[in-house]
């Protein structure tokens, strides 16, 4: 996902556009400042905080995640009111120091864009179709390789001897 996909002006070789996936889909920008990954999809390198044996992008693409927002230069999960309030064991609302009920806050789920049920079950390819926001960002060969990988189950460890024992 971090493959350089800069588009250069043929006359002066200046960068006119950059379709590198991680330039938009990562949690930091080119100046290493925090940014909200485009589409809530972080394709950055490195281990996943959810499963250190997996790369971050693998988890982001194939597993549900929480919607995030940028607050004071930090990425935090978006929390919304569930409509319920904190209660004691007898069902009475627990009040805060000011006498207000305390709402129960929950995260906002973001569905995975890929599915191990195959390429056709994945929303991932929609943005690469004709007229899509990412049309021509990946080559037909790259898209075919991803589709075939999903069609065989999107395995992380293809060699059973490399898979962790747990």
Question: Residues of each region from the PLM?
Answer:
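Aromatic- and Gly/Pro-enriched helix-to-coil junctions and flexible linker segments
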Residues: 1-166
């Amino acid at each position: 996902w971090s493959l350089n996909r800069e588009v250069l002006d043929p006359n002066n070789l200046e960068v006119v556009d950059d379709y590198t996936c991680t330039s938009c889909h990562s949690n930091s920008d080119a100046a290493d400042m925090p940014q909200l990954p485009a589409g809530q999809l972080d394709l950055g390198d490195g281990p996943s905080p959810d499963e250190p044996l997996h790369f971050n992008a693998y988890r982001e693409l194939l597993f549900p995640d929480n919607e995030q927002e940028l607050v004071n230069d930090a990425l935090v999960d978006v929390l919304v009111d569930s409509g319920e309030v904190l209660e004691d064991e007898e069902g009475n609302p627990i009040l805060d120091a000011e006498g207000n009920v305390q709402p129960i806050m929950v995260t906002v789920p973001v569905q995975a864009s890929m599915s191990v049920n195959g390429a056709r079950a994945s929303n991932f390819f929609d943005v690469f179709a004709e007229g899509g926001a990412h049309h021509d960002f990946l080559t037909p060969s790259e898209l075919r390789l991803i589709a075939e990988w999903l069609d065989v189950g999107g395995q992380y460890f293809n060699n059973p001897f490399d898979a962790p024992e747990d």
